[in-house]
C-alpha cells in the first residue's frame, strides 16, 4: 500500500529488502537490518553498475544529488501515515531548484544505516532516510529523518543529522521540511553532515519537542 502511495509522487519507486528476511530476524539481528539483501543489491547494480573501484569516490563522481529511502524501522505506522505527506511537502522545492533525485527506495525491515548502502549504490551525494522511530506511549507514529553526506557502509551516527518526532502532534511536515532543506543546502555547501553541521533554523519554525539537528540513531 505504501509503495502505491509513494508512486503517486510522480517519481520512480524501488521496492527493496534488508538482509533481515522477517520481523523476528530484524529484532534479533540489528546488523542485518543495516544491510541490503543480496537480491536488492543485484537489483540496484543491474540498474546502475557500481563505480569503477579505480576511480576516486568524490562528490563530483556521484550521479545524483539526493537519494531518498523510506524504511519501516520500528514503526511502520509512522511511515504509513507520514512519509507521503512529508515528501509531498519536500519534493516540489527540490525539483524546482534542479536537484538530481535518485529513485525513491522503499526498504522493508530496514534500519537507519541501510540508507548508506542504498545511497552509495545509487551514487548519491546525500541520502535521506525516513524511518519509523521507536514507539512511545504518546507517540506511536513518530517519524525520524536522517541525512548523510557521501553515504557508504561504515558511516557512523556522528556523521548524520537527524530531525525526529515528525508528526502532527510533534514537528509538522512543513516545519520538518524547512529544517531539512536548510540542512541539505548547508551540507552541499560544506560537503559534510553530522556533529559539525548545525541546524540554524529559527526556533519559531517547528521548535516542537523532539526536533534536533543531531541525534543517535533510534532505529
Can you name each region flagged by the protein language model?
Residues 6-8, 52-62, 119-123, 137-139, ...:
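Solvent-exposed alpha-helices and their adjacent loops that cap or buttress functional pockets
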Residues 22, 73-78, 110-111, 134-137:
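Gly/Ser/Thr-rich loops at beta-strand to alpha-helix junctions
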Residues 27, 32-61:
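Short, charged beta->alpha transition segments
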Residues 65-78, 128-130, 164:
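Short glycine-rich or small-residue beta-strand-to-loop segments that form or flank ligand, phosphate
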Residues 76-98:
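Glycine-rich phosphate/diphosphate-binding loop of Rossmann-like nucleotide-binding domains
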Residues 92-140:
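A contiguous pocket-lining binding segment that forms or flanks enzyme active sites
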Residues 133-219:
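C-terminal functional extensions of proteins
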Amino acid at each position: 500500500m505504501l509503495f502505491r502511495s509513494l508512486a503517486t509522487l510522480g517519481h520512480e519507486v524501488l521496492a527493496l529488502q534488508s538482509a533481515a528476511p522477517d520481523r523476528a530476524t530484524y529484532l534479533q539481528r540489528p546488523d542485518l537490518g543495516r544491510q541490503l539483501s543480496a537480491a536488492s543489491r543485484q537489483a540496484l547494480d543491474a540498474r546502475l553498475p557500481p563505480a569503477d573501484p579505480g576511480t576516486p569516490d568524490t562528490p563530483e563522481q556521484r550521479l545524483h544529488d539526493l537519494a531518498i529511502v523510506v524504511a519501516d524501522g520500528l514503526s511502520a505506522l509512522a511511515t504509513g501515515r507520514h512519509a507521503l505527506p512529508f515528501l509531498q511537502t519536500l519534493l516540489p522545492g527540490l525539483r524546482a531548484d534542479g536537484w538530481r533525485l535518485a529513485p525513491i527506495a522503499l526498504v522493508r525491515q530496514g534500519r537507519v544505516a541501510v540508507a548508506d548502502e542504498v545511497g552509495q549504490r545509487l551514487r548519491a551525494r546525500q541520502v535521506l532516510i525516513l524511518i519509523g522511530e521507536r514507539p512511545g506511549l504518546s507517540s506511536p507514529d513518530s517519524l525520524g529523518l536522517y541525512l548523510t553526506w557521501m553515504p557508504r557502509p561504515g558511516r557512523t551516527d556522528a556523521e548524520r543529522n537527524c530531525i525526529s518526532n515528525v508528526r502532527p502532534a510533534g514537528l509538522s511536515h512543513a516545519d520538518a521540511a524547512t529544517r531539512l532543506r536548510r540542512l541539505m543546502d548547508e551540507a552541499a555547501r560544506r560537503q559534510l553532515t553530522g556533529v559539525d553541521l548545525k541546524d540554524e533554523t529559527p526556533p519559531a519554525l517547528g521548535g516542537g519537542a523532539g526536533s534536533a539537528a543531531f541525534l543517535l540513531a533510534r532505529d
